[in-house]
Amino acid sequence: MQKKIEHLTFFKQLKEDLQAAVDNDPAARNTLEVALAYPGVHAVWAYRLCHRMWNKSPLLKLPARIISQLTRAITGIEIHPGAQLGRRLFIDHGMGVVIGETAEVGEDVTIFHGTTLGGISMRKGKRHPTVGNRVIIGAGAKVLGPITIGDDVQIGANAVVVKDVPSCQVAVGIPARNRPAKNKQPHIDPAVSD
């Protein structure tokens, strides 16, 4: 599912992440404000650096983890350098977001604060979710285990998702239940829309 984005230059990736925040946050007034004052953007930028280090050499894994932990201390957002995150990821507000080592996230995904893409076991190997393209994950949602979230999915605020969610579905509740998406508007939390 995850496409390699190594063909993009590092700075092109950073620019795309910046533009994703500007495009997806109605409160964003300009790129300078976003570049200086958005912890979600800072965390994604630090991840991009750490991920390159993680994949470059075993000798760079420890420095990548250290930078990742410093970023967590500054932003409140924890992204493991081994995770695979697609282009134009937007983490809005961000405090309390956790993305585990084997998580895979597609392109044009929006993640709100308090979200966990976590594991449900301590075993080696794939233990975190795979998230498709154009997915919106509401505030406080927990997406747990080696499950697959399809493209164009909306996950409601505080949902606990422990089973696959097919494309073009909404997942809400504890445990989350899937239903067809009624609201096709981007960035509307399905937990509060009709």
Regions found by a protein language model. Give the residues of each.
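Soluble, non-transmembrane catalytic domains of enzymes that act on hydrophobic metabolites at membranes
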Residues: 1-25, 90, 106-110, 114, ...
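Left-handed beta-helix
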Residues: 75, 81, 86-87, 92-101, ...
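Terminal amphipathic alpha-helical/low-complexity segments used for targeting or macromolecular assembly
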Residues: 1-71, 75, 186-194
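Arginine residue identity/basic-tract feature
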Residues: 29, 48, 52, 65, ...
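Residues at secondary-structure transition points
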Residues: 40, 58, 62, 80, ...
